[in-house]
Amino acid sequence: MLKEVMHIGITVSDIEKSIKFYRDILGLTFKGQAVMEGKETDALFNMENCKIKIAYLNGSDNIIAPPIELLEFINHKTIEDKPQLNKISTSEICFKVNNIENVYKHLLNNNVECLSSPQEFDFTTYGFGKSKALYFKDPDGIILELMETF
């Protein structure tokens, strides 16, 4: 049946602005972009005259983690909604980091909105490990997470 997660799609309002954020601030590697349109695209997205810019960014060359797919709808207005962690949806995308304190400072230096400073958690009694985590937002307000495990 299912084999693996191929990519994680994020609908954005401005693909160039989002590419700069995910590439220049978060350090993902830009892999390329394309435009999707035509009858197959209309069918896949269940929209008429659908035209979408897509871009792929990756955090690893050997794709041990699924790439991020950015989508900007050209012919259809993007419906804005305020992302919330307690809303029934995909709540966040989590990125593993080696030094969360340094990455946190980097985000602040780049005027990225963070929901908190890094917080430490101990889930060893539940069979998991210890970690530090924080939530932050991309240019469209999409909630992302950083986690350092130890």
Across the structure, where does each feature detected by a protein language model lie?
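Helix-adjacent hinge/juxtasegments
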Residues: 68-72, 83-85
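Acetyl-CoA-dependent GNAT
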Residues: 72-75, 149-150
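Vicinal oxygen chelate
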Residues: 10, 33, 94-150
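Short, well-ordered beta-strand micro-motif
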Residues: 56-58, 72, 96, 135
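A short, acidic/glycine-rich surface segment
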Residues: 38-43, 76-81, 121-127
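Short, structured motif recognition centered on aromatic/hydrophobic residues
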Residues: 65-68, 90, 144-146
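Short, solvent-exposed beta-strand edge segments and adjacent coil->beta transition regions
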Residues: 3-7, 52, 88-92, 131
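Core segments of cupin and vicinal oxygen chelate
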Residues: 11-64, 127-129
